[in-house]
Design a protein with these regions (language model features):
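Non-catalytic alpha-helical scaffolds and adjoining flexible linkers that form interface surfaces
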Residues: 1-26, 31-236
Length: 236
């Protein structure tokens, strides 16, 4: 775990979520390039004339400074560090979904620089409306990989090469199996796994089955508590 024990200045961050704290402040959950997910208190941010109030926007690349040695740090300043990325419609819904995944699955104060950079690119793609479903699948795969839950796509659970014409039953902790063993698995054809492993989502079948597979795996790692954004992205 990365220990945040002193003033951290000009850190690249994204705001994942904010919520009220006491009478005039906010708790700000951020994803930072160097320190991963960090919880900050923005003192007085809910006051009408607060300089922080208009800056704490999700999906925008920001620079923040904070200090503290406990789990809840104190935010000292925040500013834009890139051009504004407009988010609307499905892109906005997807942004909320990805932010909630990070809040739910990322441990606090661990460095995920590679994932941060991937998130940055993902936000740019979403703001431009670039193939939203494929953008989601790529981020979901990257997130699980960074968390140590790699989705193995080129070999089955017995280390045999995936065959395009075979049907598999994918289990979260085992991978692709040729025979059905449990209800906690999802049916997928070999060609879909091969396509995903090659970052190829052109096929309509692959697009649909990859969505179902990733939804199944994400739900497995989330556990019993559903996402708050679930109703928003059911059709994504």
């Amino acid at each position: 775990m990365v220990k945040v024990t002193s003033l951290k200045e000009n850190q690249q961050v994204y705001v994942l979520h904010t919520y009220p704290f006491k009478e005039t402040s906010l708790i700000v959950e951020i994803f930072s390039k160097e320190f991963g997910r960090v919880s900050l208190v923005a003192k007085g941010a809910r006051r009408p004339k607060s300089a922080l109030r208009g800056m704490l926007q999700s999906f925008q690349a920001l620079e923040a400074s904070w200090s503290g040695i406990g789990e809840l740090k104190t935010l000292h300043g925040i500013d834009w560090c890139d051009q504004y990325l407009p988010m609307e419609g499905n892109s906005l819904i997807c942004g909320f979904y990805l932010n909630e995944l990070l809040l739910r699955l990322l441990p606090k104060e661990d460095n995920y620089e590679s994932l941060f950079n991937f998130y940055h690119t993902t936000m740019e793609n979403l703001s431009q409306g670039i193939n939203i479903e494929v953008t989601l699948r790529r981020f979901e795969l990257k997130l699980l990989l960074e968390l140590g839950y790699e989705v193995v796509l080129k070999a089955d659970a017995n280390s045999n090469e995936i065959k395009a014409d075979k049907t598999y039953y994918y289990e979260a902790e085992q991978g692709a199996l040729e025979k059905f063993r449990t209800e906690k698995s999802i049916k997928v054809i070999g060609q879909t796994l091969i396509d995903m492993g090659n970052d190829n989502f052109d096929s309509a079948t692959t697009e649909l089955q990859s969505k179902n597979l990733m939804r199944f795996l994400i739900n497995y790692y989330l556990g019993d508590k559903p996402l708050n954004s679930k109703q928003l992205f059911l059709n994504i």
